[in-house]
């Protein structure tokens, strides 16, 4: 119930308190992205895109609940890894390529690395994690990399 009220508070003029008629309401990305839980996250737009039904960042109540479920501290590692992979796959081709990694590193470092440093980090990640050496990370490659990152579960979450 707390999440419903959190969703309703984002856009009280859009979201009815009585949901028995199953309205097709979507809270705009601008409101989702400005939530205290997301506003400082460098991936807030990608998170909203991945969890929104149409990929536009506008969320139904179900999308909103899914996002908080996956991003909760109690969600299983495999589920978190799957959604982290989708978030880092900026071009939505079901692989994390060098360009996706550049986007990820740039956001993680908030643009503080030079282009050469970003490229070096991306090359190192691919060297370490690209199991089949095809120049990109599959979901399986990514999951294997996550297994070696003990702090992944504690950092990939949103507290409400």
Curated annotation (Swiss-Prot):
Record's keyword annotation contains Cell division: no
Spell out the CDD domains in the cross-references.
Answer: EFh (cd00051)
InterPro entries for this protein: CIBP, EF-hand-dom_pair, EF_Hand_1_Ca_BS, EF_hand_dom
GO molecular function terms noted in the UniProt entry: calcium ion binding; magnesium ion binding
Q: Which residues form the EF-hand domain?
A: 39-74, 76-111, 117-152
Question: Where Ca(2+) 1 is bound, by residue?
Answer: 89, 91, 93, 95, 100
How it assembles, according to the record, is:
Monomer and homodimer. Interacts with ITGA2B (via C-terminus cytoplasmic tail region); the interaction is stabilized/increased in a calcium and magnesium-dependent manner. Interacts with TMC1.
- Further notes on this entry? The binding of either calcium or magnesium significantly increases the structural stability of the protein in comparison to apo-CIB (calcium- and magnesium-free form).
For this entry, the protein name equals Calcium and integrin-binding family member 3
**To which species is this protein native?**
Mus musculus (Mouse)
The lineage is:
Eukaryota, Metazoa, Chordata, Craniata, Vertebrata
Name the gene that codes for it. Cib3
């Amino acid at each position: 119930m707390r999440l419903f009220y959190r969703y309703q508070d984002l856009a009280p003029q859009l979201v009815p308190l009585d949901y028995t008629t199953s309205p097709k309401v979507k809270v705009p990305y601008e409101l989702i992205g400005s939530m205290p839980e997301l506003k400082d996250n460098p991936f807030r737009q990608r998170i909203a895109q991945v969890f929104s039904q149409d990929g536009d960042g506008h969320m139904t109540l179900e999308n909103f609940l899914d996002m908080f479920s996956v991003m909760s501290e109690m969600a299983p590692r495999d589920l978190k890894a799957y959604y982290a992979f989708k978030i880092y796959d900026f071009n939505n081709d079901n692989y994390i390529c060098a360009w996706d990694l550049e986007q990820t590193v740039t956001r993680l470092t908030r643009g503080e690395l030079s282009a050469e440093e970003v490229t070096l980090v991306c090359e190192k990640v691919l060297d370490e994690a690209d199991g089949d050496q095809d120049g990109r990370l599959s979901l399986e490659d990514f999951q294997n990399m996550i297994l070696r990152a003990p702090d992944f579960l504690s950092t990939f979450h949103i507290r409400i």
